[in-house]
From Swiss-Prot:
Protein name as catalogued: Acetyltransferase adrJ
Organism, scientific name: Penicillium rubens (strain ATCC 28089 / DSM 1075 / NRRL 1951 / Wisconsin 54-1255) (Penicillium chrysogenum)
Function: Acetyltransferase; part of the gene cluster that mediates the biosynthesis of andrastins, meroterpenoid compounds that exhibit inhibitory activity against ras farnesyltransferase, suggesting that they could be promising leads for antitumor agents. The first step of the pathway is the synthesis of 3,5-dimethylorsellinic acid (DMOA) by the polyketide synthase adrD via condensation of one acetyl-CoA starter unit with 3 malonyl-CoA units and 2 methylations. DMAO is then converted to farnesyl-DMAO by the prenyltransferase adrG.
Active site: 174, 422
Region (Disordered): 430-451
Pathway where this protein functions: Secondary metabolite biosynthesis; terpenoid biosynthesis
Molecular function, one GO term: acyltransferase activity
Length: 497
């Protein structure tokens, strides 16, 4: 190699028969390009790998579903595009599926034994990243280059089988889909396993772009927080302060939290009582808050202490708003499903003094009401227009608020219902027992592991993974290492209250 030679191999040669489709603008944001997702579903059953492969093969041969077998390329203009093979075969399969077989029980495997499980009490587990050597194949992709400089299909699946359990790990680049988009794939996959082809919707795939149309209906200036959008100066100031924080607190950890059903029930009752007391004094009806609202309120209050936030500080709680469930007409078709990323961030502004003084119920209600305000058709359209304008200029999603604020983000995967995925037709033998002590159902995941691979930090990001068959809630958060001690205290308090 010469001094100025690139060590990057050339992209594979374009196959003339491939159909080439540019990626939707919305899917090309830098944060999408830079994030690879792993979702692992752990079953207390032995699944038939050949049935899994056959059903997915049949799905990706169906009409628009074939698009999911596309290859990702970067064209000469630096734009991402999909190359969809005219047909799939052994040399160019629609997806990658590998299988690691272990003859022992999962409990006897060094890493398998460390997969989190419910204990009946609130618990914090080590980083889900530590399970990656078991849950992903040795050559599983971690970077966009692993797709663009190979002929790798979009979906990479690794199945790990034990004598009494199975884990399915799906790996994909965020440009393909968000978690709700992956749920669309999983639902269609399981429908074919069950022989229910009629339940599979048409795919609003790579050729359809409702988000761009959505962003052209209402001016960005109509967005309720438009006057707080970061300009270049505010953005650089915010980034600089966050870089300083990461230099000062260099170590960070991703941890998994399990909150038992009984604890969350008590927490929600507490929140409802607090809201009721305020509403009664004001003579109004008692507003509703969901379990997810209460969980996020509890998390925000916990981080107020864990991060040492000030009473005069602005705290921005950024909720990922799923546009598919925003009830907007662009996504209301019962016969088709949108594939891709369909997210906007819905900010709730809080002051440190509010978090210090107000009860849990009031914080949860503030978050819920703020999100509801931003779910109207006009606000969804204005938010989308703002994000498109910002991405065109910078490649990044828009930020609003104060450069000195503390940003806490939340992505609610519970809406994807990952614990409800029914793979029972592929069960060969089951160790899942339904009883008064064990509510686990055959062919449904008992645990879901979520990991993001990125050069960017996910510090102060919470993922609400979902609620298992026993109604226990699972969360994954990334915090600077020293903050976890305070969060552990708050988790243990839930068990003693």
């Amino acid at each position: 190699m010469g001094l100025f030679s690139s060590t990057q191999p050339p992209q594979p040669t374009t196959v003339p028969s491939d159909e080439i489709i540019p990626l939707h603008f919305w899917n090309t944001a830098l944060c999408m390009r830079g994030t690879v997702l792993d979702v692992s579903l752990k079953f207390d059953d032995v699944l038939d790998v050949s049935k899994l492969r056959d059903a997915l093969n049949r799905l990706l041969e169906m009409e628009d579903w074939r698009q999911l077998g596309a290859r990702l390329r970067m064209n000469v203009d630096g734009k991402l595009e999909y190359h969809i093979p005219a047909h799939f075969d052994a040399s160019r399969p629609a997806f990658s599926m590998t299988n690691a077989q272990h003859e022992t029980s999962i409990a006897d495997h060094p890493l398998g034994a460390r997969i989190p499980h419910t204990t009946g009490t609130p618990a914090i587990f080590p980083s889900p990243d530590e399970l990656s050597p078991l849950l992903r194949s040795a050559d599983a992709p971690k970077h966009i280059d692993d797709w663009t400089y190979s002929d790798r299909p979009q979906l990479c699946i690794h199945v790990i089988t034990f004598s009494d359990a199975t884990v399915i790990t799906i790996t994909w680049l965020h440009t393909l889909a968000d978690v709700m988009g992956m749920t669309t794939i999983l639902n269609a996959w399981t429908a074919l396993l069950q022989g229910n082809r009629e339940a599979i919707p048409k795919l609003q795939g790579f050729r359809s772009d409702p988000l761009t149309q959505l962003g052209q209906r209402t001016p960005a200036e109509k967005y309720m927080h438009f006057n707080r959008v970061f300009g270049r100066k505010e953005f650089l100031w915010f980034i600089g302060l966050n870089i300083f924080d990461r230099l000062w607190y260099r170590q960070e950890e991703r941890r998994t939290i399990c909150i038992p059903a009984t604890c969350l029930r008590s927490l929600r009752q507490q929140a409802s009582s607090e809201i009721s007391a305020t509403s009664s004094s004001e003579g109004g009806t008692v507003p509703f808050v969901s379990e997810s609202d209460v969980l996020l309120g509890w998390w925000v209050r916990s981080l107020y202490g864990a991060l040492g936030l000030r009473t005069d500080q602005t705290i921005l709680v950024n909720n990922a708003l799923n546009l598919r469930t925003s009830l907007h007409e662009s996504f209301m078709s019962k016969d088709s499903a949108y594939m891709g990323n369909a997210l906007c961030m819905s900010p709730t502004f809080l002051q440190g003094q509010q978090i210090a003084d107000e009860p849990l119920g009031q914080i949860a209600l503030r978050i819920r009401e703020s999100v509801a305000e931003q779910r109207t058709p006009e606000q969804v359209e204005a938010m989308t227009a703002l994000q498109m304008q910002t991405m065109e200029k910078t490649g990044y999603l828009a930020l609003v608020g104060d450069p000195r604020m503390m940003l806490l983000s939340c992505s609610n995967w519970h809406k994807a219902r990952l614990f409800d995925m029914d793979f029972s037709p592929a069960v060969l033998q089951s160790s899942a027992q339904s009883s008064s002590q064990n509510t686990q159902k055959k062919g449904k995941p008992s645990y879901v592991n979520g990991v993001q691979h990125s050069e960017n930090s996910f510090r102060n990001v919470l993922s609400v993974i979902g609620k298992d068959a026993g109604r226990n809630w699972w969360l994954t958060g990334v915090l600077r290492t020293d903050a976890w001690a305070h969060v552990e205290e708050q988790v243990h308090k839930l068990g003693s209250s």
